Every structure is written in C-alpha cells, then in structure tokens.
Amino acid sequence: MGIGKLSSAQGVSMDLKEFFPESGHIQRLYCDRCNGHLDLVFDDFFETVSGVEISISGLPTLHCPKCNEKYLPDDSRFAVIHLHEQATKMSSDIVKVTRHKTNQNFGFGTVPFIYDSDDYKYIPGLKRAGDQGFLTPVFFNREVLLKYDSSPTYRLSFASTTYGEIRRGDDFSMPFGLNGNGKVVMWLGDIARLPETEQYYLRSENIESDHSIGSEFYDGQIESVFTALSKEDDLFKARSEFLEACFKKFGSKVAHLDKEVFDLSVTFNAPIVDTDKERRHVADTLNKIYLESFDNKVLGAVVKNLGGDPKSLGSIKRLQKFIELSCPTLDASTIMNPFYILYDLRVAYSHLGSDESGEEKLQYVSVRLGIKPDSGLMEIYPSLIEKLHESFTKLTKAL
C-alpha cells in the first residue's frame, strides 16, 4: 500500500508507520494506478490504526474518479498521527471526532469571493511559504470569460481549449483554466490584482468550489508540465495566436467567441465514426469555430483602413480581402483554400443523399485536400485540420 493511500476495505487494521512519509515522498495530485488527476473530497475515515479505532467525519481525502483509489493529503495523514498520539497518551483505544472546515479568509482584496480555504490547504502543490492563500482556486461559471472576449480592454489568449490567459495591454496577464466539470478556475491572488470593478464582475459569476482542479491549467501552473496538445487543441491555439497577432497590429479583435462557439470549442473532439450525423456535426462545429466567429464588421473596417472596399464582399470573401491587404507576402488564395474547403464540406454534407451536387462537392473537397476523391470523413478530417493549422500559422508569422 502506497504512502497515504487508503485501504480499499474500511475497518482493516493499519499500522501507524504507514502514515509517515518515506524519505523524499511528496503526495501529488496524480493517481498511482492510472496517473489521472485526483479530486479533493471530504470522506468519513474509520480505521483501526495500531490498536486504536480512529473515526473522523469529513476528513479531506484525494479521490481518483477514474479508478476510485483514495489517498490522504499530507495534513490529513498528520491529523491521524496526532489523534493516535493523543489516544495513546490518554490510554484510550477509541477516537471519534468531527472535522470542521477551516473557512479561512486569506485577506486578498475587498471583494468577498466564494472559495474554500481547504482547497489551498489540502490540494497538493498549492501551499507556499510566502503569500499564504495566493494559489487558492476560485471557481466560476464559464460564461465569465465571454465578457473579456468582447471587451475592448481585455482579450483572451488560449494555449489550449482548457488553458489560457486574460490579457490587458502588454504588461498584464492572468491565467485561467477549465476543469473536468466545465468550471473556470483562477487563482485568488491573481484576481486581487484586477481593478475593483472587474473583481465585482467576476464575483457575479463566482460559484462554490467543486474541489476539482486537475487540468492542463494545474499541470502547467503547479507542476510545470505541458502535455502534447491534441490536434484540435493545437488548431485552436493557432487560431488564438493569429487573433492575438491581429490585435497587436490593428488594435482590433477580428473574431469573437460567443457562448455557443465557446461551448463547442471546449467540448469538441475528433470524430470516431463516419456517420451522416457525425459528418454534419463535425462540419457545422468547425464552421462555427473557424469561419462564423470572424467579425465581419471589424474585418470590413480593417479592409477599408488598408485601402480596400468591403461593401460588396460576403463574409468569406471579406476574410480573403483582409488577408490580401494585411499579408501581401502571402498567396491569399492558397491561404484561404482550407477555409473554402471547410465551407464546402458543410454544404456537401448537408446535401448528401438529396442530390448529386453534394457528392460532387465532396469529391472536390477531397481533391483540393490532395487525398482520394472517394475519401470519407476519417480521411478528410485530419487533412483539413492540418491545412487549417498551416494557414493560421503562416498568417501569424506574416503579420
């Protein structure tokens, strides 16, 4: 049994030595069995430890939701050790206590945010010698990010669909993450650096902690571990870098994430089956994220400032004109090719089975991607994702 790991059967006798850490051992937020992230839960502990029956109600415990393993955080193990020592001194073989939550106010700022000080104290990696409470996780509805995406002062930058930064100018950034339950997580100390008006806005979307912080956000911020991105996350990151480059050059946000698009980007995964329903879902979702999210009004204004006339141009043609004028060193038609293919893919999949035009357009999509004309979704999808990524990357470098 590993250090701090709980017995699978409650009531099985344990040796007190099991609660003392081995030299160099540090309890981390990863399961020993599956390496998945652990959540903080408050469990009832009932074990016989070296002859003393110890019962603790609400003991902070780390739980793996994947394989149901449980581990004790360091302070919980020390609590068991302390209770055993007290019982031994009093010649008692039974200890029964109810733990009360710490409910500590760490004193960051004047806005009363909802957070759980137990998260800071019991989630591995958050406690620091200085700035006590700085890394306390504060949880929000994910709609909280939409204001910053539409704000003229702030902007969002994504390293992946679940890890990003809120930026202001070139000298301020605040990291955020999305946990496995779709909640936005930020650090209490970072929030306190915001103007008070912004803190009150955040407070309006502030929710109770669900004690689940394992994510790319945690891995990067606490463990300095950056896992390889999926092709979907890598494409979304490339889009974000392009939008950031546009903002720095033109001072305008040429695309936005409304609630629907943001939800789609967070939950979207690569297709695993080739069905009519999956085809339409993939094509519609990619269109909404990578085409429809462009702000035609802003693109038109930039085109006009660069000497072009956007009046007679539709949305996709307006994007092409923007590229022609802002990136003259690039072949705009080549850069735009994946975007036209994406548009045609949705049209093709929406007409399949109803007329021949859908099948013809689908073959044309495959030909332009450089794959077999009769290719299905499982061949088209990875090729299109790669082409879109190439275009965003080239655009960012050209800007």
For every predicted segment, state its role.
Residues 42-48, 76-83:
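Short cysteine/histidine-rich zinc-coordinating motifs and their immediately flanking basic loops
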Residues 11-25, 68-70, 74-79, 88-341, ...:
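Amphipathic alpha-helical interface elements
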Residues 46-61:
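Short linker/helix segments within small regulatory modules
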Residues 356-366:
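A glycine-biased, small/acidic residue-tolerant capping/turn segment at secondary-structure junctions
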Residues 25-28, 61:
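Residues immediately within or flanking Cys/His clusters that coordinate Zn2+
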Residues 31-34, 64:
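Short cysteine-rich clusters marking metal-coordination/redox-active sites
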Residues 35-38, 71:
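Cys/His-rich microdomains that often coordinate metals
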Residues 365-379:
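Short secondary-structure subsegments characteristic of cysteine-rich extracellular domains
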